[in-house]
Amino acid sequence: MLLSDRDIRAELSAGRLGIDPFDDSMVQPSSVDVRLDSLFRVFNNTRYTHIDPAQRQDELTTLVEPAEGEPFVLHPGEFVLGSTLEVCSLPDDLAGRLEGKSSLGRLGLLTHSTAGFIDPGFNGHITLELSNVANLPITLWPGMKIGQLCLLRLSSAAEHPYGSSAVGSKYQGQRGPTPSKAYLNFAQR
């Protein structure tokens, strides 16, 4: 069941759901708007001949931060990682779904490629997979609304929520845009 604005506020008031920093004006009828942080991970296109999910490629991305008061410019066809300004903490009976903002989608900005689902028990910044499918550069301003977090109540609490040792939670507690750890899904060679 998708949580309403009333349900979201009740979960926050009870301390079960965490969104920090929280601004009540960001609560929408069935979601909470989230904002863009100031850190980005850009791909180093000359470090490797290709991306191999089975290999640890630590120099695949570089962390960058625009100067204070300046935007990050995302060029057509470019893909970077960003993150939410907010740290989100979900209890073991709520899952999240990150959706883009309609106004930004109409400009050609995609906020996630495939990973818009947030497991119950997750705690951390939500990494954004930002793509510009427009024909012109898009300026991304730290602090701007970048997406909306929808919350869904599970039929029962997760037996092994994200962060428990049983599920191999690679991104629990992540801070800022976190690069892929897909290599951990492969047997070490």
Curated annotation (Swiss-Prot):
UniProt site positions, description: Important for bifunctional activity: 116-117
Its EC number(s): 3.5.4.30
Catalytic activity: dCTP + 2 H2O = dUMP + NH4(+) + diphosphate
GO molecular function per UniProt: dCTP deaminase (dUMP-forming) activity; dCTP deaminase activity; nucleotide binding
Catalytic residues (positions): 129 (proton donor/acceptor)
Record has Nucleotide-binding as a keyword: yes
Binding-site residues for dCTP, renumbered to this chain: 101-106, 119, 127-129, 148, 162, 174
Pathway: Pyrimidine metabolism; dUMP biosynthesis; dUMP from dCTP: step 1/1
Keywords: Hydrolase, Nucleotide metabolism, Nucleotide-binding
Subunit details: Homotrimer.
Similarity comment text for this entry: Belongs to the dCTP deaminase family.
PANTHER family the UniProt entry points to: DCTP DEAMINASE
Protein name: dCTP deaminase, dUMP-forming
Species whose genome carries this gene: Rhodococcus opacus (strain B4)
Lineage: Bacteria, Bacillati, Actinomycetota, Actinomycetes, Mycobacteriales
